[in-house]
Amino acid sequence: MMAVDKHFSELRQGDIIFLDFNPTKGDEQKGYRPCIVLTKPLRYLNYMFGVAPITTKAKQFPLHVSLTPEMHVQGEVLLEQHRMLDLETRSFKFVERAPIDLVTECTIKLKLMY
């Protein structure tokens, strides 16, 4: 798995990136970890991105989405932990792009929360 630098303006919905989630509180996912970009680029807030962390500790939960076996990053997307982050001020590394089916499943489940 080769992580590469990208400018935040190059990120797209479905990109898998590594970034530092700190600072966090309570049971929020902490530290440097993979996540999926959930939002499409916003013209008026192009530095703010909705992301959800990915964990390797799989648990059966309705808001978790398993990554596909052919992906470099393995685990489950934790949609209940999604949040907006300013990626202009946080360093991150691009790893890969998720298949469209996985992105669609994430966005459908995310919409169920609102």
Report residues per predicted region:
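Conserved functional hotspots at enzyme active or ligand-binding sites that engage polyanionic ligands
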Residues: 1-33, 37-114
